[in-house]
């Protein structure tokens, strides 16, 4: 997710700096690949081994917010909200902590590192619930 996030972000920053649509198209291709290929197993962002995975979701969220809000690419909002909804529904409800595998319920009291716990809150901050 990190590589996709930074590719999307770099493409968007180049698009904003130059106005060249090719860069926006590249960002869209990166977002589409993340959503349609990397996330196809559960229709959720994938997680790999490593303690830093959750922060990658936060970085992805930052650049997806730029793609959605600054570039009008709202087709990603349902996918992003699905991740939020699954991650929050499967949190450790005693502590309200989310883990990195959004499709799995968190075991109450289990160790959840701060990076893993950061992904869903980052998405929630950038893509708040509809009122």
Regions found by a protein language model. Give the residues of each.
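Extended, leucine-rich alpha-helical cores of fungal transcription factors
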Residues: 1-3
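Inter-helical turn/loop segments and adjacent helix faces that build the functional surface
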Residues: 14-21
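CBM-like carbohydrate-recognition segments
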Residues: 22, 27-131
